[in-house]
Amino acid sequence: MATQIIKDANSKGRRTALGDILKPLNSEYGKVAPGWGTTVLMGVFMALFAVFLVIILELYNASVVLDGIPVSWQ
């Protein structure tokens, strides 16, 4: 048998200091905030990230942003 099932109700997981610190972060697991929550904020950050990516793409392609600037690789 590859796995062994232990039916001992007295065995609990090991308690560590790190686990005690991280436990409050996991206490909200499965709970859903009513309404839209932070969805609007997430949308704003996604839009800002999209603008950032467009700016990087334009710089990479030397398009609209760099039209009037001479670029020399020598």
Curated annotation (Swiss-Prot):
Topology in the lipid bilayer: Single-pass membrane protein
Organism: Staurastrum punctulatum (Green alga)
UniProt-listed Pfam families: PsbH
Family matches, as HAMAP family: PSII_PsbH
Post-translational modification: Phosphorylation is a light-dependent reaction catalyzed by a membrane-bound kinase; phosphorylation occurs on Thr residue(s) in the N-terminus of the protein.
Listed name of the protein: Photosystem II reaction center protein H
Gene3D superfamilies linked: Photosystem II reaction center protein H
Keyword Transport in record: no
